[in-house]
Amino acid sequence: KAHRFIQFLAMLSGSMALQNSILKWCSDHRTHHKKLDTKEDPYSITKGFFHAHIGWVIENKNAEIKGVNDLKRNPIVMFQEKNYWTISIMLSFVVPFIIGLIYGRPFGSLLWGGILRVTAVHHFTFFINSLCHFIGTRPFEPKITARDSWWVAFLTFGEGYHNFHHKFQWDYRNGIKWY
């Protein structure tokens, strides 16, 4: 368990990704692992490449949050759940704009530090759900669609080693390689 201050910093950083609250993200991720490659998998490649890449975001708005009772006992998680949009918008767009005001480039700062950053982070994450279930190798578990892709791993700081991630889901590492 991380110190509360570290948990708080992680919550702020995760909020900046604009990929849903901790509860929603973890609920979807845990369901993905339990129901991999089935109809119940929120971002299943079996529903098509578009669905796995970004369609699940568009279609999955009212999906039930389940399997995260352990997280509901954490006050930082619950604070973020109640204030998700305020925290995310402030950190992702308002703060870059204000920093830009200080340096005389508010719209450039908003564009690079906000809009383009969020767009890049989203698509790099979406590559894991789509490309890493479509292209790559399956060295650890050949019977599932999750694959290891070195170039997606490069773009996502190791997250592209997705076959490893599914086979050894309790391992804190993204893969066995340092890169």
Please place each PLM-identified region on the residue numbering.
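Non-catalytic, topology-defining segments of multipass membrane proteins
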Residues: 1-126, 131, 171-179
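Active-site-proximal inter-transmembrane loops
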Residues: 73-76, 135-161, 167-168
